[in-house]
């Protein structure tokens, strides 16, 4: 009996992180769902890598909908994350991951504004499914439209106005976030000028989906003048990808490039400095298989980001990220799971950029609702 339940529940959990959210209100066209998880985790690594030790956190979110008419629906979502690795006396490492609201117009799509995922992540999300690591070749939080970011106005359309099944697209505008705006105080590397982006995915059938995205933004004055050797006026990113998800097999691939955008840490005179790469070429490959009767899902992935023209002479290329991830999930039931993940770093320990090249092993337990 337990095996039959797992065979049904586990695929549902893999579709979305809020698959088993608790419905706390549903009346007169108003609906409110609560979801969250507690993820207790410990990582083992060389002490010099700064990746050894506890990395536990808790996360909670609310999703709401209100039916305005038979053609118009309002919606909103808020998600908050709290790190649990510090002391009670320390300032809590907490942050708002998502906070947006909008309107959905039947088959004409939805329009929302707030803190949300950038359109470049629509494709990158397919490979960002590893137990601990992954998704870091190109996507970065508060880095234009490659990951979660602030000030995003997003239009999304499903099934191309109801005319083509499986053809989805999104258009996005991002307002400036810098010392010149109301939310000033952020690092130069996490600032952005006005920009736009678009993405499209198509469900071909037979478990196959393909997609791509493009984003182009103005850079702030500080980014052009003070950070690394990326002096271009515009920041650009694009990616293409594909995934296969059927018969308990999951395969995904993503290739993308960025210009004047990607943050990386480099050791200069024994001091770590955060810089912006002039150009990066990024690849992520993921393979997983779900043994649904056992509740076991092994995972294998390859992740690489190669920086191009990183020095003043514009002639030095070097890997910013390069590793293999070997791990697995084990699902006790729909609410409780455990996992292990081993990051085999393929960077040379004496690489010229001084990028962290240590292996990391992590293990954790997750309760989600």
Curated annotation (Swiss-Prot):
Protein name (Swiss-Prot/TrEMBL):
Outer membrane porin F
Q: What keywords sit in the KW lines?
A: Cell outer membrane, Ion transport, Membrane, Porin, Signal, Transmembrane, Transmembrane beta strand, Transport
Q: What task does this protein carry out? A: Forms pores that allow passive diffusion of small molecules across the outer membrane.
Q: Report TM segments.
A: 22-27, 29-44, 56-68, 71-83, 98-106, 109-115, 151-157, 166-177, 194-204, 207-219, 235-246, 248-259, 279-291, 295-308, 321-332, 335-344, 360-369
Q: Which residues lie on this side of the membrane: Extracellular?
A: 45-55, 84-97, 116-150, 178-193, 220-234, 260-278, 309-320, 345-359
Q: Which GO terms describe its cellular component?
A: cell outer membrane; pore complex
Protein topology in the membrane: Multi-pass membrane protein
The cross-references to InterPro entries, in alphabetical order and at most eight, read: Gram-neg_bact_OMP, Gram_neg_porin_domain, Porin_dom_sf, Porin_gammaproteobac, Porin_Gram-ve, Porin_Gram-ve_CS
Name its species: Xenorhabdus nematophila (strain ATCC 19061 / DSM 3370 / CCUG 14189 / LMG 1036 / NCIMB 9965 / AN6)
Identify the coding gene.
ompF
